[in-house]
């Protein structure tokens, strides 16, 4: 059986958040900044064939199960999957307070 492939789409907000994180990290170490961003992207891509790979987002109010989240290198990544799309919604450092959504 062939597994369905989902398309990953980064929202403008999540693109800006990962870019901001990268720019902050590269001030200390360019190689670490590159590694962290690559690891986050690789981790997101693990959900391409199974969007339920990561657990439900525990901070999402009234989560129907389509909002998922995971942590990588002290960053929390939130995405939502629908029919054929995995939409990355947020990338934030775990020291930041989560905003209700």
Locate predicted features.
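Basic, Lys/Arg-enriched alpha-helical interface segments
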Residues: 1-64, 101
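Basic/aromatic recognition patch in beta-strand/loop cores that engages polyanionic ligands
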Residues: 53-84
């Amino acid at each position: 059986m062939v597994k369905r492939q989902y398309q990953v789409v980064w929202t403008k907000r999540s693109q800006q958040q990962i870019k901001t994180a990268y720019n902050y990290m590269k001030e200390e170490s360019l190689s670490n900044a590159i590694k962290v961003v690559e690891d986050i992207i690789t981790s997101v891509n693990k959900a391409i064939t199974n969007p339920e790979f990561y657990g439900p987002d525990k901070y999402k109010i009234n989560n129907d199960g389509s909002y998922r989240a995971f942590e990588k290198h002290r960053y929390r990544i939130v995405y939502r999957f629908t029919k054929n799309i995995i939409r990355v919604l947020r990338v934030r450092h775990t020291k930041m307070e989560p905003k209700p959504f």
